[in-house]
Amino acid sequence: MKLAYWMYEGTALSGITRVAGSMQKVHTVIHGPQGDGYVNVMYSMLERFHTIPPFTLSTIGRREMAQGSRARLVETVRRVDAQHQPDVIVITPTCSSTLLQEDLLAVARTLGKQTKAKLIVPNVNAFRDLEHRAMDDFLTQIVAEFATEQPKTEQFSVNLIGPSYLGFHQLHDMQEIRSMLESLGVAVNAVIPYGASIKTLQELTKAHLNICLYHEYGQSACELLKEKFGIDYIVATPIGIRLTSQFVKAIGERAGLPVESYIRQNLAPSGTIARFTKSVDSLSALFGKRAVVFGDYSHAVGMTHLLREIGVRVVWAGTYMKTMEKAFQASIGGLADEVFVCDDFQEISHKIRDTHPDIVLGTQMERHSAARFNFPCIVISSPAHILNFPLFPAPVLGYQGMTRMLDTINSTIKLGLEEHLVNMFGEDSPGMGEEDTAQEQVAVTSDMPKAPDKTTAGEGELKWDAEATKALKQVPFFVRGKVQRNTENYARERGYSEVTLEVIYAAKAYFESKSNQGER
């Protein structure tokens, strides 16, 4: 148990409700204090439920704390069974019920003889387990409870393990993976937990292969199905060119299908991905830029691979999944200058500030930190804001997800640079006509400082050294004149006879602080 005002991972309750709430005809009774009803709000707001979410709170109040809460729980379970008529009722423990040492299994055994629904108590530790561990354990528990031997489908088919409500773009990812598999000639037998029923769980064994889409949870259920029913599985989060191609090849090998033409089709020189990665625009905007990555295991690893593939330098990559530290180090070794595991958001915030990256890829908390320090940011992992639960298709996985992410990274870096420069040096005076704009562009070009061997400093004039000249040429033309004038004014006021890189950086810091003071 950890006392904190920000946690990257949710509680065990969050994990259990993500699994149970994603299924059909499954109702969850939460045995805890009034505050644990937050789960209903999350589903209503983030997933935009048009019906009441399938959660009922068996409230532990002052009376229950003094006299015991068993009677309240029994009454709640009976009411849920009569009113909602689910196939399964999940009685989930909370920290409060654990403190009261309530024997929920005994309640389930007694009530199970009186209810039509099957009663299940998740085998998790409400104090110790966090969201993804609870998801993994509970998903394995219900698969073990309901999966039965079934004949295989005639067509090669797979089960998709992992997509659920409240996951980061997971429902969009599910549709993209379905589309990819359909293009390869592979059928989807079942998806769990999203949209799954008891019948779905019973028919899992019809599939020839299980695909665990996220490393954080689901692999234990795949292991169970392999040991008990002999179903092979792969664990893959296909983000980026290399990981997506490996994913497609792994499916092709197990299905006995040719997949090379499909990969070539998506990576063809005339295709969107190849045209973007090899374009002058991409090379000038992305190549050599400095990025930092932080998130859950799957998305942090995938995004690090993707950034390296497009020429972006990853200064550091981190994850908050402390239990997966060794695997994380092995998956990113050599792709980032520094690889680490940390769940302290303040430490990550300070690390972002000290690194001064061109772009931040992280969670909602890193978005706040990046905004505080004026760095462009993309949210690539949960925990996320409602903005990252879009109505329009926005996958992260597969070739379509890669295309979307490339577009997002490119535009974020460009717009972030423009805003940063304008904030530093200001905009030119308003009211300038098209003719004046063209004349200023010509003037800026003609006024560009030359290399030091071709420039002499007269009275009142400043000489720019070669490095400073090169740096100025890299500034976009629409603010280049302002940058040059402000830098030279700064240098003259302080008695410099030559503009160097150090002078440029000092001027940058001066005007940036001046701009921030003006905003305040």
UniProtKB/Swiss-Prot annotation:
Gene3D superfamilies from the UniProt entry: 1.20.89.20, Nitrogenase molybdenum iron protein domain, Proto-chlorophyllide reductase 57 kD subunit B
Molecular functions per Gene Ontology: 4 iron, 4 sulfur cluster binding; ATP binding; metal ion binding; oxidoreductase activity, acting on iron-sulfur proteins as donors; oxidoreductase activity, acting on the CH-CH group of donors, iron-sulfur protein as acceptor
Entry annotation: catalytic residues: 281 (proton donor)
Cofactor needs: [4Fe-4S] cluster
Pathway annotation from the record: Porphyrin-containing compound metabolism; bacteriochlorophyll biosynthesis (light-independent)
Superkingdom of source: Bacteria
The keyword Iron belongs to this UniProt entry's keyword annotation: yes
Residues annotated as binding [4Fe-4S] cluster: 36
Keyword Ubl conjugation annotated: no
Note on cofactor: Binds 1 [4Fe-4S] cluster per heterodimer. The cluster is bound at the heterodimer interface by residues from both subunits.
The protein's Enzyme Commission number: 1.3.7.7
Residue spans crossing the bilayer: none
GO biological process annotation, one example: light-independent bacteriochlorophyll biosynthetic process
Keywords: 4Fe-4S, ATP-binding, Bacteriochlorophyll biosynthesis, Chlorophyll biosynthesis, Iron, Iron-sulfur, Metal-binding, Nucleotide-binding, Oxidoreductase, Photosynthesis
Region Disordered: start-end pairs: 429-457
Enzyme class of the recorded protein, top EC level: oxidoreductase
Binding locations of substrate: 416-417
Function: Component of the dark-operative protochlorophyllide reductase (DPOR) that uses Mg-ATP and reduced ferredoxin to reduce ring D of protochlorophyllide (Pchlide) to form chlorophyllide a (Chlide). This reaction is light-independent. The NB-protein (BchN-BchB) is the catalytic component of the complex.
Family membership noted in the UniProt record: Belongs to the ChlB/BchB/BchZ family.
Subunit relationships: Protochlorophyllide reductase is composed of three subunits; BchL, BchN and BchB. Forms a heterotetramer of two BchB and two BchN subunits.
Record's protein name: Light-independent protochlorophyllide reductase subunit B
Native source organism of the sequence: Heliobacterium mobile (Heliobacillus mobilis)
